Swiss-Prot record:
It is found in: Plastid, Chloroplast thylakoid membrane. InterPro entries: NADH_DH_suC, NADH_quin_OxRdtase_su_C/D-like, NADH_UbQ_OxRdtase_30kDa_su, NADH_UbQ_OxRdtase_CS. NDH is composed of at least 16 different subunits, 5 of which are encoded in the nucleus. SUPFAM superfamilies: Nqo5-like. The gene is ndhJ. This is NAD(P)H-quinone oxidoreductase subunit J, chloroplastic. It holds the Pfam family Complex1_30kDa.
Amino acid sequence: MRGPLSAWLVKHGLVHRSLGFDYQGIETLQIKPEDWHSIAVILYVYGYNYLRSQCAYDVAPGGLLASIYHLTRIEYGILDQPEEVCIKVFAPRKNPRIPSVFWVWKSADFQERESYDMLGISYDNHPRLKRILMPESWIGWPLRKDYIAPNFYEIQDAH
């Protein structure tokens, strides 16, 4: 089932895949990494002026990595429930690269850095893409399903 935003994107020739609606009735769309930056700018101009959250997850061991964006359209003076959309961008595990939306929504800064730190997704054109939670010397991506955690003594000896 296609939602209003998906219908608008189709009308304007913007490539995406509708994933239906989540349990709260929020429209969910899949965007290809190569199309994400231009569609992000279009969504901002369309009125999605607030990045509520960005997160990432490992779809399956050895599979794709996903970067999720929850966008809200806040209109001043409108007290009703704001319009929301969930965007999913999937990247290959081997070289996961997704355009950063830092220059569209500044709130993506720490959120994209955390996704990089935990899953190794590289956000192209991010101004400060470096580890934010783990030490710079940390090897690997702790939230990947195929990550092998070092035992306690290895961590203790490293410091």
